[in-house]
């Protein structure tokens, strides 16, 4: 080759040189006319359009040779640079120009210049003065009155600023190309196939079109072809170059013979399969392998079994080095030969090499950081990796053929990091919530549950022993059974953690378990299920630290397996008990359904109600049967029924599954088109169970639900992975950068309640966070936590038990670090149990913690017409402490009950009560007093503990008469605005009048109270679903209930659940039916109805007014004369985050989003 280098073949024009130039020499195509680069006018934001200030549509018209663009108006009146002209207008202007105007130099200011195509764009871009443009846009963005134009100016400014930032490197006019590059030939190869055909890269095809059109255009220009033909050819050249760079971004992509869009330059770079994500970031790496996993019960928690052939290959270079050092071989080549032959000396060296050199195990999909952990390898025979059973939960692994990848950390730093941070025995806590994640499961739990369960009449029950040893001897001797309740002197710790020795009633099995428990934890004397074990492990970590816990876990793992094996727990079909009561319950169910059907046929209930009642009936039958079944199972064989033990311990199986085995299968899902709402359950349930066997029809119905479940899961995984990816993308730069940012701001935290059920207690929400202020006990006045201190378990418990309802804590949302966040604002690192260290990537941890459980969330949006979500609110509100009652915003009317005792009825909607400690003047409890409550105390009264302060109706919202007089109903017409319903107990003849939605939107049902002269004193609007308590013409006293609105109908609409809800919150999307929100505090007055909208006016105490139009289809959440606060919804629907931001400011939005996601 050297001899012929540089010689060019005279036949084919190829130069003789080395092969590698085929990979590095670029070519180019010189274009006859400039061409705009598609990346700069087809991408969003449209860079060229933003710089020139031309709309995208018009820009396309210029680029694709449809319109002329004025570049310099010259002497022509009424034209500006950048205006568009049609062909006719252009020719007219040319004709009207003074003689010789077109012969002037281009820089003469009076010359008229207009061009078409990319040339015009090139000239316009050359004339852009970036600094001047930037100045103008800034002025516009700050001064312009319209929001739309302000936004537009800011978007343009971004593009302008990026060009200004790269001044000297890039000019705007370079977005138009005169030359296009061609990538080296080896990267778009042409391979001859046998048969004389060629397999070619798509790029060649696209490039060919560019060259053909370019050459044709050159020929036409030389031949002086007419403008029309030239313009068409130029347009085609522009299109060819567009598809060469990006063939997917526009309609009408170039197709190949097989009608597949050709893959352009951009397509091969972008997306998951593109060059970056597939080949640069997603490379396969050396020093790695993968194999099937099997369970490894022998290794310790930080070890895994590695097949020796795999290890020999992974550690090959290390082994070769040792072979050379020991002088067994002289050259690397011979060393490699020995390693390949796997000679006996290789295994010795391998044992030596792997000491202290951990491997990383990874199971796909890696949803959170515990999906990759480090283990110390042990060489094993066979070809499968042995995984420690306790590590399975973190990897979400099981042994039904899962595979795992092994990677080898090479550098000393990597090895150190793997040993210190990633070793499996250090990762016992889940970083998402601080709960132990290495919890024994399945067999281990079953074994431990079995030996800690007591059996009253077992052999040796009631014996007393002076110590553990004696009891063990008796057990080994067969004098006492493992389950027998016996009394033993044991070592324990008291409440303050001091060691004591006392007599407890326990069993031999529990003594065995306590042998594994580290000292200082105390004697654990209870039956062990999965939940109990999780709590114990958490407790052991707190008391003894991670190292001791790892040993404890290994010990209980061995004990659990051993005992599950010794217990010989299995079950057979006769363990599946079918309750005798099953038939009678089913008969009762059928009887009820018949009654419901006859009610429906007689027209007492609507079809929807019939459906709901039938579903309720069968659900009730199912629950009853399930309860009986569980009771029977738990009593069978003194609680030693294998199925019951497996379920009760949490090892395997759920109540649901056992119910299907021996109760009834229950209601099944209905085959549905996706996206249609309506009834999701078939109303005739499957009444057989798996023990009895299903009929063909029942089997067929079952298969539908099963298949739907599987397909949902598959869809869910992809959706959830994408959510995680977006979360990591936005949060990866949030890192703990300093110890303390010194902010004085924080978030006020209180417990989250749904109705009256506490979802997250105050203890959970403040544990491990840092308090902003001193937290003072309201009763004693002592400081529980100083400002800037971490709230630990002890302090959190004191706060939880005291009357304190909210604590202001430091939060990442209010942190004032310049970059990242500070340790004080973040609080405790949940995976370690102490304050977070500098450098922790808390953003990614947070993203993973939300993304990882995403697969368990549901995918669908539930369409439920108000499910009466059993609102278990109390009727009475009691004082929890003695103190003085204070009430804000109270409006009441006086009323008397049947016995004539006076009480007060609250008619304000914003009454808030507080009970205050007499001495420290600190608030002990706060509570909202709902409208219509009966109040038993006056503000300023002293209340005692457990006094009833007020009573309210938890099941109905009410409308209260605020005046005395006669009732008059307006627009209340039977079967138009109200219907009559009969109670299910028809014989009693109890009728109810219920307001319905009328077709006539102008009717608005209301009730007025008139005085003796017939003047209207008060008018109340009647919402849909309201039940009358009084009738027309009745006389009422103040405080009487006029109308009841059942609360179950108040909860309605779409309950967006699961994954879509989380996505919706993070993107702060505006919901489909937003609620209308009050912007100011004030009194409500309802205006008249016009065009199907009701006018609502809010007047503040200062006289400020705001008007809102609320569609009649929406339910009003307020009544005439209510007092509302800013940010309260006036109609049903979801509150838009944007509204909260506008009305209550950024902190409220943060609260709303955080609480929403945590739900």
Curated annotation (Swiss-Prot):
Q: What are the GO cellular component annotations?
A: DNA-directed RNA polymerase complex
**Which residues of the sequence carry a binding annotation for Zn(2+)?**
741, 815, 822, 825
Q: Which GO terms describe its molecular function?
A: DNA binding; DNA-directed RNA polymerase activity; metal ion binding
* GO-annotated biological processes: DNA-templated transcription
Catalytic activity reads: RNA(n) + a ribonucleoside 5'-triphosphate = RNA(n+1) + diphosphate
Tell me the keywords, alphabetical order.
DNA-directed RNA polymerase, Magnesium, Metal-binding, Nucleotidyltransferase, Transcription, Transferase, Zinc
Sites binding Mg(2+) sit at 398, 400, 402
Instruction: Give the Enzyme Commission number.
Output: 2.7.7.6
Co-factor requirement: Mg(2+); Zn(2+)
Q: Which family does it belong to?
A: Belongs to the RNA polymerase beta' chain family.
Q: What does this protein do?
A: DNA-dependent RNA polymerase catalyzes the transcription of DNA into RNA using the four ribonucleoside triphosphates as substrates.
Assembly mode: The RNAP catalytic core consists of 2 alpha, 1 beta, 1 beta' and 1 omega subunit. When a sigma factor is associated with the core the holoenzyme is formed, which can initiate transcription.
Q: What is this protein called?
A: DNA-directed RNA polymerase subunit beta'
* Species this protein is from: Porphyromonas cangingivalis
């Amino acid at each position: 080759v050297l001899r012929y280098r540089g010689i060019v073949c005279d036949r084919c024009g190829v130069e003789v040189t080395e092969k590698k130039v085929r990979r590095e020499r670029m070519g180019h195509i010189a274009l006859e006319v400039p061409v705009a680069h598609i990346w700069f006018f087809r991408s969003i934001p449209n860079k060229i359009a933003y710089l020139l200030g031309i709309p995208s549509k018009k820009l396309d018209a210029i680029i694709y040779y449809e319109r002329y663009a004025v570049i310099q108006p010259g002497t022509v009146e009424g034209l500006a640079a950048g205006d568009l002209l049609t062909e006719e207008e252009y020719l007219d202007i040319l004709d009207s120009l003074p003689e010789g105007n077109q012969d002037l130099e281009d820089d003469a200011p009076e010359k008229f210049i207009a061009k078409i195509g990319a040339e015009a764009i090139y000239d316009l871009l050359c004339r852009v003065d970036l600094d001047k443009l930037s100045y103008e846009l800034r002025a516009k963005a700050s001064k312009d009155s319209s929001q739309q134009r302000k936004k537009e100016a800011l978007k343009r400014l971004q593009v302008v600023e990026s060009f200004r930032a790269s001044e000297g490197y890039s000019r705007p006019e370079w977005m138009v190309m005169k030359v296009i590059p061609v990538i080296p030939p080896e990267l778009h190869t042409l391979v001859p196939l046998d048969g004389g055909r060629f397999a070619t890269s798509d790029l060649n095809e696209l490039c060919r079109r560019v060259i053909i059109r370019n050459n044709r255009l050159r020929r036409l220009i030389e031949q002086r072809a007419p403008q029309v033909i030239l313009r068409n050819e130029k347009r085609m050249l522009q299109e060819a170059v567009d598809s060469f760079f990006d063939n997917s971004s526009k309609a009408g992509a170039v197709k190949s013979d097989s009608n597949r869009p050709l893959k352009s330059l951009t397509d091969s770079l972008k997306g998951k399969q593109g060059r970056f994500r597939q080949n640069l970031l997603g490379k396969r790496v050396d020093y790695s392998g993968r194999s099937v996993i099997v369970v490894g019960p022998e290794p310790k928690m930080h070890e895994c079994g590695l097949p020796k052939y795999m290890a020999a290959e992974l550690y090959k270079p290390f082994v070769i080095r040792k072979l050379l050092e020991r002088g067994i071989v002289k050259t690397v080549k011979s060393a490699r030969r020995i390693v390949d032959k796997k000679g006996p000396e290789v295994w010795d060296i391998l044992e030596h090499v792997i000491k202290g050199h951990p491997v990383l195990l990874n199971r796909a999909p890696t949803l959170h950081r515990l999906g990759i952990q480090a283990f110390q390898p042990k060489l094993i025979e066979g070809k499968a990796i042995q995984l420690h059973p306790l590590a399975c939960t973190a990897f979400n692994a099981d042994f039904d053929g899962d595979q795992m990848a092994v990677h080898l950390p090479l550098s000393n730093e990597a090895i150190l990091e793997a040993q210190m941070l990633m070793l499996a025995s250090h990762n016992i806590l889940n970083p998402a919530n601080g709960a132990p994640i290495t919890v024994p499961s399945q067999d281990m739990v079953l074994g431990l549950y079995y030996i800690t369960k007591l059996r009253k009449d077992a052999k040796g029950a009631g014996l007393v022993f002076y110590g553990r040893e004696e009891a063990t001897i008796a057990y080994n001797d067969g004098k006492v059974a493992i389950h027998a309740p016996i009394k033993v002197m044991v070592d324990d710790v008291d409440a303050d953690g001091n060691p004591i020795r006392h007599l407890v009633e326990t069993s031999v099995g529990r003594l065995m378990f306590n042998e594994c428990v580290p000292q200082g934890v105390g004697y654990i004397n209870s039956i062990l299920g999965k939940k109990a074990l999780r709590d114990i492990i958490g407790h052991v970590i707190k008391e003894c630290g991670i190292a001791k816990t790892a040993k404890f876990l290994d010990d209980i793992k061995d004990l659990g397996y051993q005992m599950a094996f010794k217990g010989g727990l299995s079950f057979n079909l006769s363990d599946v008990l079918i309750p005798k009561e099953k038939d009678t319950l089913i008969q009762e169910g059928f009887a009820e359904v018949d009654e419901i059907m006859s009610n429906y046929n007689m027209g007492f209930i609507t079809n929807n109600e019939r459906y709901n009642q039938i579903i309720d009936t069968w659900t009730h039958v199912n629950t009853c049967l399930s309860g009986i079944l569980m009771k029977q199972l738990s009593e069978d064989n003194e609680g030693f029924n294998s199925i019951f033990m497996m379920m009760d311990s949490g090892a395997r199986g759920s109540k649901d599954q056992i119910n299907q085995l021996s109760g009834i299968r229950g209601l099944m899902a209905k085959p549905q088109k996706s996206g249609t709402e309506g009834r999701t359950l078939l109303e005739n349930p499957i009444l057989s169970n798996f023990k009895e066997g299903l009929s063909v029809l029942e089997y067929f119905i079952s298969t539908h639900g099963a298949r739907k479940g599987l397909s949902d899961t598959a869809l869910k995984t992809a959706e959830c992975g994408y959510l995680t990816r977006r979360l990591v993308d936005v949060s990866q730069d949030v890192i703990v950068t300093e110890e303390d940012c010194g902010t004085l701001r924080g978030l006020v935290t209180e417990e989250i309640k749904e109705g009256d059920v506490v979802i997250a207690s105050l203890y959970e929400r403040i544990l491990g966070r840092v308090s902003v202020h001193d937290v003072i006990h309201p009763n004693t006045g002592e400081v529980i936590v100083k400002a800037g201190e971490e709230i630990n378990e002890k302090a959190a418990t004191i706060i939880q038990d005291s009357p304190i309802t909210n604590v202001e804590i430091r939060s990442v949302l209010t942190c004032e670090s310049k970059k990242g966040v500070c340790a004080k604002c973040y609080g405790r690192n949940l995976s370690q149990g102490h304050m977070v260290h500098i450098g922790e990537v808390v953003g990614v941890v947070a993203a993973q913690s939300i993304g990882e459980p995403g697969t368990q969330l549901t995918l669908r949006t539930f369409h439920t017409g108000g499910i009466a979500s059993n609102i278990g609110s109390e009727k009475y509100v009691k004082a929890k402490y003695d103190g003085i009652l204070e009430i804000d915003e109270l409006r009441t009317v006086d009323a008397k009950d049947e016995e004539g005792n006076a009480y007060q009825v609250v008619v304000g909607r914003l009454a808030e009560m507080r009970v205050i400690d007499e001495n420290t003047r600190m608030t002990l409890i706060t509570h909202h007093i709902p409208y219509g409550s009966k109040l038993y105390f006056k503000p300023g009264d002293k209340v005692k503990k457990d006094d009833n302060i007020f009573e309210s109706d938890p099941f109905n919202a009410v409308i209260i008469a605020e005046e005395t007089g006669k009732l008059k109903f307006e627009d209340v017409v039977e079967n138009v605005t109200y219907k009559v319903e009969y109670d299910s107990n028809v014989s009693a003849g109890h009728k109810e009048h219920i307001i319905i939605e009328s077709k006539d939107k102008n009717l608005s049902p209301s009730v007025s109270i008139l005085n003796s002269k017939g003047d209207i004193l008060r008018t109340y609007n009647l919402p849909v679903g309201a039940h009358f308590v009084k009738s027309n013409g009745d006389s009422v006293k103040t405080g009487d209930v006029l109308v009841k609105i059942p609360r179950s109908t108040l909860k309605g609409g779409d309950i967006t659940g699961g994954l879509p809800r989380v996505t919706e919150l993070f993107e702060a999307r505006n919901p489909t039916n937003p609620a209308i929100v009050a912007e100011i505090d004030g009194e409500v007055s309802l205006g008249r109805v016009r065009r199907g909208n009701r006018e609502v006016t809010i007047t503040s105490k200062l006289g400020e007014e705001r008007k809102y139009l609320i569609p009649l289809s929406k339910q009003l959440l307020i009544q005439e004369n209510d007092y509302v606060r800013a940010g309260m919804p006036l109609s049903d629907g979801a509150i838009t985050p944007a509204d909260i931001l506008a009305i209550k400011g950024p902190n409220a939005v943060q609260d709303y989003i955080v609480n929403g996601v945590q739900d």
